[in-house]
Amino acid sequence: MAKGEFIRTKPHVNVGTIGHVDHGKTTLTAALTYVAAAENPNVEVKDYGDIDKAPEERARGITINTAHVEYETAKRHYSHVDCPGHADYIKNMITGAAQMDGAILVVSAADGPMPQTREHILLARQVGVPYIVVFMNKVDMVDDPELLDLVEMEVRDLLNQYEFPGDEVPVIRGSALLALEEMHKNPKTKRGENEWVDKIWELLDAIDEYIPTPVRDVDKPFLMPVEDVFTITGRGTVATGRIERGKVKVGDEVEIVGLAPETRKTVVTGVEMHRKTLQEGIAGDNVGLLLRGVSREEVERGQVLAKPGSITPHTKFEASVYILKKEEGGRHTGFFTGYRPQFYFRTTDVTGVVRLPQGVEMVMPGDNVTFTVELIKPVALEEGLRFAIREGGRTVGAGVVTKILE
């Protein structure tokens, strides 16, 4: 299971690609690994096919699952998620984007911003991605430099609309495909040897400089939302996810909180990251935790692992919510008390019933409102927790828990 120990030397930052389908997110992800690998023997190259794994996706050329790759610059170690681009897979986008200290927004220069470009910027805002760097891709397909300036202006405007600092955001122009083709021909191509490869370096520099090393919540009590669970024969059950805060090491007692009627305690018997054993997992790490005496059925996606007593399951809360306009992909009509959408917390959807405050008859798309929610299953909740409101697989609102009621 583990091969060698993961040594922590450089600061670790989580990034990922977002943007419209077929604008080049996966090709760019591959190019980043190739370019970084030419200057650092520790980096493993990944090709488009490696990142775009599941067979049914390849046929349509659409990435569905969230792929994780790693690369390094002289300054930092990066974990990079390639987020699904297709609208049907927003659920993955929500979990994927939640794992980013900064996002690389890929926009095709030939098309300019498209509906999913807007949707992904909105999602990044909702799930709290703090920084965005823009890679304007496919610039080799546009002859008119004025057109490139126009696309850049549109992207900056769009970022401003969703409260990102559109005027300050770095925008790098390049071609992921031409850089990747060059790296395939000459895998040792270094900085300064090819104009397209240099554009990828320009992007890496921008990520290094513009996305700050996150201030990790290491000193808070341990919490990790469970994303996936699997069994390792002879060793037990492993829960994977990104540590939201605190730290965890072998021998620590943790609680499994949410979804189940009872909160249960267990002990962590192993910590792993990228298939290597880790002395200690800290906030921001994507890890697998081996849990003592817990069967595959007793822990599931949507629960959290947490320091005992630090967080409790709740079903009723008050929230401040923004309901998307029709133009933003939201509902076309208003809703009343008794509305039952899904509430997407951390890694899962839970159905809940909305109660509007006294004097509010109806909530319309575009409204900002405070209401109470009663969930059908308990979730590990606390004030300040963000969530998405969804129905029929699409996001119709975004909110934040303002008060726990029960």
Curated annotation (Swiss-Prot):
Region of interest called G4, as start-end residue ranges on this chain: 137-140
Superkingdom of the organism of origin: Bacteria
Gene3D superfamilies referenced in this protein's UniProt entry, alphabetically: P-loop containing nucleotide triphosphate hydrolases (3.40.50.300), Translation factors (2.40.30.10)
Keywords, in A-Z order: Cytoplasm, Elongation factor, GTP-binding, Hydrolase, Magnesium, Metal-binding, Nucleotide-binding, Protein biosynthesis
Region (G3): 82-85
GO cellular component: cytosol
Region entry G1, spans: 19-26
Domain called tr-type G: residue spans: 10-215
Class of enzymatic activity (EC top level): hydrolase
MF annotations from Gene Ontology: GTP binding; GTPase activity; translation elongation factor activity
Region (G5), start-end ranges: 175-177
Function: GTP hydrolase that promotes the GTP-dependent binding of aminoacyl-tRNA to the A-site of ribosomes during protein biosynthesis.
Binding partners and assembly: Monomer.
HAMAP family: EF_Tu_B
Family the entry assigns: Belongs to the TRAFAC class translation factor GTPase superfamily. Classic translation factor GTPase family. EF-Tu/EF-1A subfamily.
Protein name, UniProt field: Elongation factor Tu
